[in-house]
Regions:
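Charged DNA-binding/catalytic regions of mobile-element recombinases
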Residues: 1-252
């Protein structure tokens, strides 16, 4: 059993972040008939620990433009989506590098938690969140009147240029209240996952912004979307969950 566990945690540079719950799910996917408690016991005995949130970590605050109210909240904390491209959630966060701050903006599809667009920039500007949105629009098929785009009331997301881009694409803008992380919990959840498993993983440092961007590319496009399994998706990765949806005869 130890050999199988070590193999699960060795298939990718980020697989070592798996704790016993995900290791157990992956073993079940591979056909092992093993109990979750046994996996926990073996990993504890051999000091195999997964990633965990460091104490004291907090997400950054939102700065609302004083003259912009933002769109109404169309979700009211209900982030469930019956199909892809029905609800997208967005946020931005910052990473520290040897060259200074690098801001990351992302767009996440609520159906399978897949990151459908992201962008980086040294500054948290409207151009940054527009770049992430354009990445998402280029990678997905969006139908007019079917998609809600939810964010906080940050100045970047309430900027006229950004709102107009949504309207032009046939997307309904939605914003949560100021200072309440629960109103954009699905988007912010990505940051805790990314920082636990990448940014704060022991030994991780970014000498340059380019180095950080390359690490994000490996994590998001090479691990999180295609391979990182989630209990809420039935032990599938976001890509696998969407593929299963497409192959379901009821959704063709």
């Amino acid at each position: 059993m130890l050999e199988a566990i070590v193999k699960v945690r060795s298939v990718n540079e980020f697989a070592a972040t798996y704790g016993s719950p995900r290791v157990w799910l992956e073993l079940r996917r591979q056909g092992f008939r093993v109990g979750r408690k046994r996996v926990e016991r073996v990993m504890r005995t051999h000091d195999l620990q997964g990633a965990h949130l460091r104490r004291g970590w907090k997400h950054g605050s939102t700065r609302q433009h004083p003259e912009r109210r933002g769109a109404p909240d169309l979700l009211n904390r209900d982030f469930r989506a019956k199909a892809p491209n029905r609800t997208w959630v967005a946020d931005r966060t910052r990473l520290i590098t040897g060259e200074g701050v690098l801001w990351l903006a992302s767009v996440r599809d609520a159906f399978a938690n897949r990151v459908v667009g992201w962008a980086v920039d040294p500054r948290a500007t409207t151009e940054l969140v527009l770049a992430a949105l354009d990445h998402a629009l280029a990678s997905r098929q969006v139908h007019t009147g079917q998609l809600i785009f939810h964010s906080d009331k940050g100045a970047q997301y309430t900027a006229l240029r950004f709102t107009q881009r949504l309207v032009d694409a046939g997307i309904a803008p939605s914003t949560g209240s100021v200072g309440d992380s629960f109103d954009n919990a699905l988007a912010e959840n990505l940051w805790s996952t990314l920082k636990i498993e990448l940014v704060y993983w022991p030994g991780t440092t970014f000498a340059t912004r380019a180095e950080a961007e390359h690490a994000l590319l490996r994590y998001i496009d090479g691990w999180y979307n295609p391979r990182r399994i989630q209990a809420g998706l039935g032990g599938l990765s976001p890509d696998e969950y969407e593929q299963a949806h497409r192959q379901d005869p009821e959704h063709r």
